[in-house]
Every structure is written in structure tokens, then in C-alpha cells.
Amino acid sequence: IIIDGGSSDQTLQLIKKYSTRVKCLISEKDNGIYDALNKGVKLATGDIVGFIHSDDILASPQVISNIVNKFKGNTADIVYGDLLFVDREKPDIIHRFWHSGEFKKSKLRYGWAPPHPAFYIRRALYKKYGCFDLNFKIAADYDQMLRLLLVPYLQIIYVPEVFVKMRLGGESTKLNNALLSTKEIIAIMRKHNINWQVAILTRKLSKLWQIFSKFKRSNIS
């Protein structure tokens, strides 16, 4: 399923080259990225839902099959992995390594969350807990993940594998959106009864660790 925001470049022509592999294409103006994601969720018919944004790259051809096998083998509700922030022009150059780590509910109090592009869930959870809140323009994915991760009985599986390479320069990584992103994250933390003063600080520190982990990962490689 491809949701396009009414592109005026060569996007649609490129998609047509792969028309036999595209189940559904919508190209129309929307109310932002989360409106587009909500459209995709409503059109989905499979058991598992995940998202790949236009600048994202699956880390390997085996990523999707590995995710599906985890759902099958563990009757999981949520499966998530790791993510690499890479150079926009040269995606082999790593800028940050987002190592998610094993899930512990206590980590949510410190601003922890897995990377949304590496977060796959059963479609039934959208029906039960809702889609993305369009009141948030940049951080609705964080709100949606918290909504699910705080549910006590869901089976959540971490896969220590890079699922996605994200090119730097997305909406939430642009400088002019940094203040709005922080404002929304604080509002979301308050909504979910998380001490935002502590969580925002530890969240910022975790980004420094991601940069350090990049060098550590490079040395291992």
C-alpha cells in the first residue's frame, strides 16, 4: 500500500514501473504524515502493519520475513528492532545507531521508546487502541507507541537486528521542527503520566549514546 501526498515530481511515474507489486495507491493531498499513515492503516488487510517512509531503506532483503517469523513463532503482538541514521546522499555512512534493547515497562518513565520505523504491530491493535492522533504533527508516533507499550498484557518482542536505515533530514529531525517536536513530546508524556522533566533529559542523553554506539558499531564491523 502506497500513500502519496499528491506529489508533483516523478514519484507516480516511478511507482507505475512497479505496479504489479503495488496493491493500492492513493495520491492526494493530506493533513500531514500521520493523516497519510492513518489512511494506510484503514486500507490494510494483513495481520501485521509496519511503515516505510519515502526516505527509509530496509536494512536487508530478509527483514520482513524475519519480522513475520517472530510474529508466528512467538504469537507476538508487537515486534521491534534497531535503526541506523545514515547520510542522505551516501546511506552507507552511519551517523547514529539506535539500539533499542529489550523491552522493560520501567524504561518508559525515562523517555525510552523504540524507533517507529522499526516498530511492527498486529493490525487488530489499531482497531482496539486507535490510530495516530492528528493533534500531534511531529510526535504522534511516540504517542501511539506509548499507548500500546503501556498495555499490561501485550506480548512485546525485541529483535537485536537493524530493521531500517533512515536518511537524515526527516520532519522530526529538521532544526525548524525541533522546538515543536519537544513541545509535543512533553505534552505526550504528560498525557501518559510520565515525569517529563526527567524523561526529556534522559531522552536527550540517549541520543549522545546513539552517536557513541555508531563508533562502537563501526569498530566491531
Residue spans of the language-model regions?
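Charged/polar, solvent-exposed surface patches and flexible loops
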Residues: 13, 17, 69, 187, ...
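Membrane-proximal basic amphipathic "stem/tether" segments
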Residues: 190-221
